[in-house]
């Protein structure tokens, strides 16, 4: 009999793996682990899970014994090697990192995180990325919660940069898709006027002056203030603006907007009245900039009343405030997908924002040093930001295009377009000619024979119109000499014969008279027609009278309902018809040739059905231009099955005419 295979024993396997892990750490070689893994009985999953437990057990002992960070990192490096050799699960190194960062103090976490930063290429590899990205994100967020934003600024920045390097640009977890604001960023300042020392400070400065004490800046280093008169009201209004920069949606509220408008005008007036010169900048700061010295600053404002005068005299501080204005204005004017439909600026607000934006750019250009260059750079960056805003509104599609599965590119054979490929492909089964105007003309009447039979294509004049002049000349009372009569004109005679053949029965009736020439024959026909047709006017019309009659006829045509309906649709008509269209706007949209992307944009912009209907009609008007007429709109309504609305629009048009 064959011997029975050995069964897997968890305690024995764990002891063996723990011993092998210690040996591998001492030798700095993974071979002991590989040997133990191959010799132990059991399935691969059982051995992997046991080795994962062994790693965590060894790491726990090192943390309890307060071992150096190098020993801890050696265990994690060994686990990375184990994943590469397929002897432990891919999530093991990340679990170990999480355990270490949870147990060690912040100063040692800095060393551990340096190791994490150096191995970013490892984390992004196919072996580790899918299994570890959520662990790393959770680990970094937990670490950020432990860190102080004011004392550990650099460490927090390193974590954010690491996440930016680890995840692709289109990663949803870091995009703030719903455009939320950091409402926790509250700027605290003195709101009790009784505790303010601004008035006392300025009084003492005027009477006694300010002495330079030991430890303060000397004459060479102290920036000269711009002598801005600061009181508590200016201090309070200035720092109150930070709440609007923190939460811009307050500007859509009527009362809050008035407060923001008032405070902003006062603060910007102070910036305009008290401008800074290059000489007011700190000499020490200027020397550091010239020599390439490191310029370190902290983004959180200091709101002490004692610093207000120095802050307003600081060019960098002014730039911060003016930049906040520009960012706020860009949000208020921009199209944000998740912005509520109620958040709409009035014309007055839009005009004020436009004027104030110009003033802010002007203040930036006048602010030293290199104000003009800085202003242009900021304007360029904010213009570029519009592209990112559009990308975000579209759902942040990935910039990376996936390769086709076939390695060999197949040759694309261009098929010659058949008539069926471009005839009747539009939403209204339109024939696409390739030009907007030609397409419109071609589709006025799809049936060519019916178009030829249309009354509008009847160019042949009536007998009365054509022979009116000849009948007047044939009247003896008018005394027109024979040589000046129209019947003597050969061109007129040729056209007269063709018209008589089409419209007069006398042309085919036999006659006993013998005519020597065409003028004589036409003279005889004119006399016959004069007896049958209504009598002409008593006076021979002059050229001016004919022009006046033509103008009157043209005016009458313009006053006719058909011509009125051929005029472009007005804003009042759009407003009135949108209320009737309502929820049926989406049925009409394809028949107005509105693109699917525009329809989706209309749905995102507003939840009100009447507003969506109005936006649809406005988009159609912008698309068609002068061809956006009520007649074309009625035609589209009939084709879409909305005949009731088409009849209502027809009645409204005739009533208004």
Swiss-Prot record:
Protein name per UniProt: THO complex subunit 1
Record keyword Plastid present: no
Residue list for modification Phosphothreonine: 4, 542
Modified residues (N6-acetyllysine): 133, 300
SMART domains (UniProt xref): DEATH
All residue ranges annotated as the Death domain in the record: 570-653
One Gene Ontology term, aspect cellular component: cytosol
Distribution of this protein across tissues and organs: In the inner ear, specifically expressed in inner and outer hair cells (at protein level).
Record's compositionally biased regions (Basic and acidic residues): 553-569
Gene Ontology process terms (BP): apoptotic process; mRNA export from nucleus; mRNA processing; RNA splicing; signal transduction
Originating species: Mus musculus
PTM field: Expression is altered specifically during apoptosis and is accompanied by the appearance of novel forms with smaller apparent molecular mass. Polyubiquitinated, leading to proteasomal degradation; probably involves NEDD4.
Subunit structure: Component of the THO subcomplex, which is composed of THOC1, THOC2, THOC3, THOC5, THOC6 and THOC7. The THO subcomplex interacts with DDX39B to form the THO-DDX39B complex which multimerizes into a 28-subunit tetrameric assembly. Component of the transcription/export (TREX) complex at least composed of ALYREF/THOC4, DDX39B, SARNP/CIP29, CHTOP and the THO subcomplex; in the complex interacts with THOC2, THOC5 and THOC7. TREX seems to have a dynamic structure involving ATP-dependent remodeling. Binds to the hypophosphorylated form of RB1. Interacts with RNA polymerase II. Interacts with LUZP4.
């Amino acid at each position: 009999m064959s011997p029975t295979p050995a069964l897997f024993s968890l305690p024995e396997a764990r002891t063996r793996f723990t011993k092998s892990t210690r040996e591998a750490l001492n030798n700095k070689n993974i071979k002991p682990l590989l040997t133990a893994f191959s010799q132990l009985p059991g399935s691969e999953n059982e051995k992997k899970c046991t080795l994962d437990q062994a790693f965590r057990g060894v790491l726990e002992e090192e943390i309890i014994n307060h071992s150096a960070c190098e020993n801890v990192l050696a265990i994690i490096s060994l686990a990375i090697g184990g994943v590469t050799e397929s002897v432990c699960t891919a999530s093991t190194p990340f679990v170990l990192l999480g355990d270490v960062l949870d147990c060690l103090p912040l100063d040692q976490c800095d060393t551990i995180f340096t190791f994490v930063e150096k191995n970013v290429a490892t984390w992004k590899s196919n072996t580790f990325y899918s299994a570890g990205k959520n662990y790393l994100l959770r680990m970094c967020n937990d670490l950020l919660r432990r860190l102080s934003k004011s004392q550990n600024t650099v460490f927090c920045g390193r974590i954010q940069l690491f996440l930016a390097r680890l995840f692709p640009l289109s990663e949803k977890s870091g995009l703030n898709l719903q455009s939320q604001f950091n409402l926790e960023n509250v700027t605290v300042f003195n709101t009790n006027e009784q505790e303010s020392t601004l008035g006392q400070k300025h009084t003492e400065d005027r009477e006694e002056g300010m002495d330079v004490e030991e430890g303060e800046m000397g004459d060479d280093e102290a920036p000269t203030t711009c002598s801005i008169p600061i009181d508590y009201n200016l201090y309070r209004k200035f720092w109150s603006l930070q709440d609007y920069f923190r939460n811009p949606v307050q500007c859509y509220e009527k009362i809050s907007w008035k407060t923001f408008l008032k405070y902003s005008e006062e603060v910007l007036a102070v910036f305009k009245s008290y401008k800074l010169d290059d000489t007011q900048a700190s000499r020490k700061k200027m020397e550091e900039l010239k020599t390439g010295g490191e310029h370190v600053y902290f983004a959180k404002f200091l709101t002490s009343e004692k610093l207000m005068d120095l802050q307003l005299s600081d060019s960098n501080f002014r730039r911060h405030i003016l930049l906040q204005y520009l960012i706020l204005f860009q949000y208020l004017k921009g199209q944000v997908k998740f912005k509520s439909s109620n958040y709409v600026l009035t014309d007055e607000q839009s005009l004020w924002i436009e004027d104030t934006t110009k003033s802010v750019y002007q203040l930036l250009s006048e602010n030293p040093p290199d104000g003009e260059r800085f202003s242009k750079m900021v304007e360029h960056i904010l213009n570029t930001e519009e592209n990112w805003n559009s990308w975000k509104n579209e759902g942040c599609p990935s910039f990376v295009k996936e390769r086709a599965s076939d390695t060999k590119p197949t040759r694309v054979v261009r098929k010659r377009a058949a008539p069926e490929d471009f005839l009747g492909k539009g939403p209204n089964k339109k024939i696409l000619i390739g030009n907007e105007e030609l397409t419109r003309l071609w589709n006025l009447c799809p049936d060519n024979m019916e178009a030829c039979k249309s009354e509008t294509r009847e160019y042949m004049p009536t007998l009365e119109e054509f022979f009116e002049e000849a009948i007047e000349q044939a009247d003896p009372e008018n005394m027109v000499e024979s040589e000046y009569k129209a019947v003597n004109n050969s061109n007129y005679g040729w056209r007269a014969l063709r018209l008589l053949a089409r419209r007069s029965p006398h042309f085919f009736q036999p006659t006993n008279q013998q005519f020597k020439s065409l003028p004589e024959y036409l003279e005889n026909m004119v006399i016959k027609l004069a007896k049958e047709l209504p009598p002409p006017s008593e006076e021979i019309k002059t050229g001016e009278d004919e022009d006046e009659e033509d103008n009157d006829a043209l005016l009458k045509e313009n006053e006719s309902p058909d011509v009125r309906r051929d005029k472009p649709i007005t804003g009042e008509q759009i407003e009135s018809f949108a209320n009737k269209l309502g929820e049926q706007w989406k049925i009409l949209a394809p028949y107005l040739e509105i693109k699917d992307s525009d329809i989706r944009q209309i749905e995102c912009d507003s939840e009100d059905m009447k507003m969506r209907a109005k936006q649809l009609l406005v988009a159609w008007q912008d698309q068609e231009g002068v061809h956006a007429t009520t007649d074309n709109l009625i035609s589209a309504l009939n084709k879409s099955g909305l005949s009731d609305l088409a009849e209502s629009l027809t009645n409204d048009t005739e009533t208004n005419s």
